[in-house]
Amino acid sequence: MKKFHFIAIGGSAMHNLALALHHKGFQISGSDDAVFEPSKSRLAKAGILPEVLGWYPEKIHEGLDGIILGMHAKKDNPELQKAILLGIKIYSYPEFLYEQTQNKTRVVIAGSHGKTTITSMVLHVLSYWEKEVDYMIGAQLEGFDTMVHLTDENDFMLIEGDEYLSSPIDRRPKFLWYKPHVTLISGIAWDHINVFPTEENYIEQFRTYIDSIMPGGVLVYNELDSVLEQISKESQNTIRKEAYHVPEYFIEEGVTYLKTDEGDLPLEVFGEHNLSNIAGAKWICQLMGVDEAEFLEAISSFKGASKRLEKIGDNGSSFLFKDFAHAPSKVKATSDAVAQQFEEHHKVYCLELHTYSSLNPTFIGQYKNALSGADQAVVFYDPEALKIKNRIPLSEQQIKVAFGTENLIVFTEPDEFQEFLLNHSWKKSILLMMSSGNYGGMDWDALKKHVLSF
């Protein structure tokens, strides 16, 4: 039985990989200095939750087949140092996935935005038709126990390909490990400025990625992204290239319909970005053996990935949506989708700035007009988060100028922000909450109850 130890086992991706390997019959151990829900309960149920928090070099021994190193660990981590000393093979998360899938057809979904949704769409369609594949996805999907599934027998491996760094000691983007046979790139919008300081540096990662596609492979790309189209066409890699765009659709009584040769198809999701995602997912599914009619039947029941334009509640008049959007292109796409779908409603868009990039004075201008579809735009950020990072807090004026939106309110106190929401009248209104954080501790139950009381 193979034995692997996870350094930083509690992370979203890491604990899912640990569970997948445990289910595959490997012996798994791990460490972390903090483990939160749902990781904690899921690891405990499998019997692989660390008994005590912290880093313990004595857990590292020559009987291990390898170490899987998470991004949360630091370079000077005592367990990592012991593993280096003993000469144990140290894998980054993506490197290990590649090792496990060398004999499979690797299908990778990449791009600055839409990765999780497109991967979820493909997985939903394959599951609908009971087609078994291995997979790694970046969000919990309804009907799937884990975000990672690995077998010896499945032919395909579907991977959500992230451009962020592989590990603390491997500064390559994760997706450069995967060497796909088939890949989709949804778009390129500068992100992760803490590791890609210039836009050109960021774009260069995607150029390198396109060149890493296996010879004879297929690149599916969003032709409406001019930068992506250019670098796709420029690549000299011996691959097939297929472009996609937003398909024909219309909205009637709050429902989005896709125009198809088989007739008008009602969808559970909405927004041009999601329609574009559907067009891309269709290409990938067809390349994985699902025909167009089968795809359309299955996609009509897709409700969306967790935290992506997730409807928390509605009463027919008022709606509360939650979205993971935080990068400028994602915020703009989500905002525009809601504005188009709910033209008659009063719309309040709230965005929390809490990532390294979003709070950077040189980057915040990328958010210009991102909230322009709102009747009332709100930005929340916690100055304490900047102090922890030894950064100077942004002024209210800096934020207003950056967003270029007249009707913008800025909150820096969680209590004041919640008070604003709980004193607002939500009759025939849309409240869209966008963040990869939690607004300083949002009481979602109280907010939902209030919004739906009108």
Residue ranges of each PLM-predicted region?
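Phosphate-binding loop of NTP-binding sites
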Residues: 20-24, 58-62, 71-221, 227-238, ...
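Beta-strand->loop->alpha-helix junctions that form or flank phosphate-binding loops
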Residues: 52-55, 91-98, 136-139, 235-253, ...
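Short pre-catalytic strand/loop immediately N-terminal to key active-site residues, enriched for Gly-Thr
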Residues: 265-270, 318-322
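ATP-dependent carboxylate-amine ligase
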Residues: 1-37, 43-50, 63-67, 83-88, ...
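Short polybasic amphipathic segments
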Residues: 255-260
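Fold-independent oxyanion-binding glycine-rich loops
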Residues: 9, 31-32, 70-72, 93-94, ...
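Short, flexible loop/turn motifs enriched in small residues
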Residues: 176-178, 250-254, 304
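A generic structural signal for residues located within well-ordered alpha-helices
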Residues: 117, 273-279, 326
